[in-house]
Amino acid sequence: MASPRPLRRIPAAPARARLKERYEDAATIYGIPYWGKGFFHISEDGELVVRPTREAARGVALKQIVDEVALRGITCPLIIRFPQILASSVASLNEAFARAIDEYEYANVFRGVFPIKVNQKRVVVEKIIEAGRQYGYGLEAGSKPELLAAIAADLAPECLITCNGYKDEAFIRMALNGVRMKKKVVLILEKVSELDRILSVAKLRGVRPLLGMRAKLYARGSGKWAKSGGEAAKFGLTTPEMLEAVKILKSRRMLDAMVMLHFHIGSQITDIRKIKLAIREAGRVYAKLRALGVPIQYLNLGGGLGVDYDGSKTAFDSSMNYSVQEYANDVVYTIKTICDEENVPVPTLVTESGRAVTAYHSVLVTNVLDVADRIEQDRRVRVTSGDAPVIQELAAILSSTNAKNLRESYHDALQYKEELFTLFNLGHLSLEDRSKGEILFWHICERIHRDLKTLKEVPEEFEDMEKMLADTYVC
């Protein structure tokens, strides 16, 4: 992608200084250096720049794109996709595992799959397939249309197609047809009852299936989807159910069909400690199954690899306290250690990462229709001796607020704000009185916020004041 075209002449020195201030303000307010992951950047004139390959020389200003498509008659709202970001994300994930495998001398490989349900756009899936071909990167399907698309996709021979979700006879037949076509289509058991159905259809079709089973681990994830894992999870086989499935396969001389162990403890896992616990438990389950003679080849860690949406690098729901490389290192090291202890071969590692691959690649652009100001700068009130005492008290606080009494002024303002609404609800104040009181309160907050910038340390109770005073954009 070409570099941004210069849209204006180089400004004079004082103007350049102002632009630098704009850049620093934008970077601070929007936090792009923290969550942009190298794909997004603020230019020196304060514009948002996208770097699809993370190379500064190949960046493009988002405004420039919007202006150019507007010349073609395309107006907002619109979605701009950057396929290069998809390719970069696929490469980052696979190369992180490659580095970990090399560092820890892991005697097997990584074979990731992309869950089609995360983004079913054909252009997205095809770009991921193209970018992942050199890594043997496959697909995950959870419905018949997705499975049909996965089987028809131009995947490399070593690529996996994993099948999760509900499996009726039509779905099973479709998967078995894929196996007949020499595709590595793995049907993952979510319930023991699915096994008899799969084996019956496979016998009728004359195809030996490739099977996996989803373990219901004791370990749980973190974040909004933590309940997807743990003992109360909706899907997955308990330990007795896994042993029952093994017994059924042994009795039918089809134990060699069980090639994958799978688990999933939730999407957007925010805390690496939860991931480590799940990996350790799943590694032991894998090793014990191998010791029982189950020839599992793949350990599928499911999804959950997070995205640091807010750039805080914490375990909050909108963030993650680990990197992709740390994730890969922990997976490889933990599984290798357990397999060495149990004297079993290490499995091929599989993940079903979706959001971590696609989250950054598209940008929604929309027009701002209006701005709702919390405080209208030109709105002032005139307080007289005839005004209610609560109004006069708020006016006095406003006039006396300074850097030395910010906390006291704020506490007093909150008290009189409560009194204002109480008196209004009791019928002792007019609508005009209430309006005056509200305006005075917000002007007090604005003055406090302004004076906070002069302090070295901001008191904890004022940390959310910037959000409280923020304008609301109507899009």
What are these regions (language model features)?
Residues Y104-N300, L305-V307, Y322-E326, T334:
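Active-site-proximal beta-alpha core segment in soluble small-molecule metabolic enzymes
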